[in-house]
A protein has these predicted regions:
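Alpha-helix N-cap/helix-start motif
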Residues: 25, 57-61, 109, 124-125, ...
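Ferredoxin-reductase
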Residues: 41-119
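Gly/Ser/Thr-enriched, mixed-charge loops and adjacent short helices
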Residues: 111-201
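Active-site flanking residues adjacent to catalytic metal/cofactor-binding acidic residues
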Residues: 10, 51, 101, 175-178, ...
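An N-terminal, well-structured beta->alpha segment
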Residues: 1-66, 70-71, 147-171
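Residue-level detector of short coil/turn "hinge" positions at structural boundaries
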Residues: 14, 75, 97, 142, ...
């Protein structure tokens, strides 16, 4: 099950499981994998995959990876992530594409995927339309992919931000991340650059 209206201009979002189920997510992975293979002209492109803090995001990610792997993609899973961290990983690990399982600021109950192929760029409307066509019409390629976990990438991302952003004058930062994924990252990073941090939630 996959609702066509979930394909938006720059990313994809659905209510889960009302508008998309795990089989639908796997088909999205097949569609994205097929698209990446077409655009990179590689049989086994490397794709960075991450997920946000929602309780069901890991099962969504597992289904997405299953679809990607079935097309021949090599997955590099960086685990719990922020969207900018996934884009950073594409440069840091020199991969071919990214797929971030998140519904951004949408409330709980939503899921989605932010995607990009060219470094520093997310899918544009024409790429989303192409992905929609491939996915809904099952125009999938088949291949033999693989996956590996990049277990320490949170630390790599935090250290990069901290080392580039030291402050001279100590300031007090009140951090309210609204129970979002940023709560795993922001306090540590702000302390690392020299702030006194007060965490609210």
């Amino acid at each position: 099950k996959i609702d066509p209206f979930g394909f938006r201009e720059y990313d994809a979002r659905w209510l889960y499981p009302e508008n998309i189920n795990l089989e639908g997510v796997a088909n999205l992975g097949k569609g994205l994998g097929t698209q990446v293979i077409k655009h990179t002209n590689k049989k086994n492109p490397r794709i960075i995959v991450g997920h946000d803090y929602r309780s069901y995001s890991e099962e969504i990610k597992a289904a997405l990876k299953k679809g990607l792997i079935s097309t021949g993609c090599y997955i590099e899973d960086i685990g719990l992530s922020l969207s900018p961290m996934v884009y950073f990983a594409q440069f840091n690990l020199d991969s071919d594409a990214v797929a971030m399982v998140t519904a951004s600021h949408n409330e709980n109950g939503w899921t989605g995927v932010k995607m990009g192929i060219k470094k520093g760029l997310t899918h544009a409307p024409e790429e989303m339309q192409e992905l929609k066509d491939i996915t809904l019409n099952s125009k999938f390629v088949e291949g033999e992919g693989s996956e590996k976990e990049i277990s320490n990438f949170q630390s790599i991302y935090k250290d990069d931000l901290i080392n580039k952003n030291k402050i001279q004058k100590k300031i007090k930062a009140v951090v309210a991340c609204g129970n979002g994924t940023a709560g795993i990252f922001a306090p540590d990073i702000l302390r690392g650059i020299g702030c006194e941090v007060i965490e609210l939630d």
